[in-house]
UniProtKB/Swiss-Prot annotation:
Phylogenetic placement of the source organism: Eukaryota, Metazoa, Chordata, Craniata, Vertebrata
Assembly information from the UniProt record: Heterodimer with RPLP1 at the lateral ribosomal stalk of the large ribosomal subunit.
Species, as recorded: Sus scrofa (Pig)
UniProt-recorded name of the protein: Large ribosomal subunit protein P2
Ranges of compositional bias, category Low complexity: 69-90
InterPro entries reported for this sequence: P1/P2_N_sf, Ribosomal_P1/P2, Ribosomal_P2
Residues with the N6-succinyllysine modification: K21
């Protein structure tokens, strides 16, 4: 992702076809070490393409990805009722999971940018 971001910054900054040297320079300026193989892969995939078209295609692909909330709602009607003995155990597990999530979410203020 860092290579794509650096490529996009260079392209949007006026460099129509950024080279590996351009991207490496941008990454080095923020203290990120560049992997030559990944860098060359990004350049070969994006070289000669219109950045606006690539962004539009990406937005179209993201629109087709289901969000996290819809899956839980869709699963609820199809699930069978659990046995009476297992319900308290399931409730305890859910409480424990919620506690763990709340501790983790404090680190990133409840929003995981790279999750």
């Amino acid at each position: 992702m860092r290579y794509v971001a650096s490529y996009l910054l260079a392209a949007l900054g006026g460099n129509t076809s950024p080279s590996a040297k351009d991207i490496k320079k941008x990454l080095d300026s923020v203290g990120i070490e560049a992997d030559x193989d990944r860098l060359n892969k990004v350049i070969s995939e994006l070289n000669g393409k219109n950045i606006e078209d690539v962004i539009a295609q990406g937005i179209g692909k993201l629109a087709s990805v289901p969000s996290g909330g819809a899956x839980a709602v869709a699963a609820a009607p199809g699930s069978x009722a659990p046995a009476a003995g297992s319900a308290p155990a399931a409730a305890e597990e859910k409480k424990e999971e919620k506690k763990e999530e709340s501790e983790e979410s404090d680190d990133d203020m409840g929003f995981g940018l790279f999750d």
